[in-house]
């Protein structure tokens, strides 16, 4: 019964962005996988729903220039296990220090390094805005801004708790 109530509340309030199947789309996270920027515990999911999240990836075009964007794109794609031009990727790796503050020195993201913001893991080949060379270049060149709205004042804590439990259950079907 609780699962069905959670599903109904999810469909009414969350499906517009995350999809009726909770698999997300470009710019909206998949809630069924295990790729979570802030953690996938029931408490963290509830906190995200209650208070929302704001994420920002800065634009690097001015700092890197066209050549630097191309090099950094190659390195980021190499981190994800893709075939790239090694010379470009090596040059990108030399510049990766400016990215390490958020993504960690190994590119595994803020969650892997207990950092307080939601910088994604660049090594898992999961891409919120697309993993094509063009999409990665656009992210580096222009940056990204993501907003998850706060639902505490809209739905109240009880309904948020039920939706949180539903999301946790669909993202952890083995538990």
Where would I find each of the regions flagged by the language model?
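Sequence/structural segment immediately N-terminal to covalent heme-attachment motifs in c-type
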Residues: 2-20, 47, 84-113, 137-142, ...
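Extracytoplasmic electron-transfer domains, predominantly the class I c-type cytochrome c fold
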Residues: 26, 32-81, 115-169
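Generic C-terminal helix-cap and adjacent flexible tail
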Residues: 169-175
């Amino acid at each position: 019964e609780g699962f069905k109530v959670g599903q109904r509340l999810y469909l009414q309030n969350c499906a517009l962005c995350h999809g009726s199947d909770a698999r997300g789309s470009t710019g909206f996270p998949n809630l069924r996988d295990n790729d979570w920027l802030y953690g996938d515990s029931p408490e963290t999911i509830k906190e995200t729903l209650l208070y929302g999240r704001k994420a920002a990836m800065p634009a690097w075009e001015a700092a890197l220039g066209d050549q630097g964007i191309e090099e950094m794109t190659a390195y980021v794609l190499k981190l994800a296990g893709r075939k790239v031009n090694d010379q470009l990727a090596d040059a990108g790796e030399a510049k990766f220090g400016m990215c390490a503050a958020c993504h960690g020195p190994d590119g595994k993201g803020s969650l892997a390094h207990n950092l307080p913001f939601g910088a994604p893991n660049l090594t898992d080949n999961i891409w919120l805005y697309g993993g094509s060379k063009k999409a990665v270049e656009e992210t580096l060149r222009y940056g990204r801004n993501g907003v998850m709205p706060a639902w505490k004042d809209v739905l109240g804590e009880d309904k948020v708790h039920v939706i949180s439990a539903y999301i946790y259950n669909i993202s952890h079907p083995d538990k």
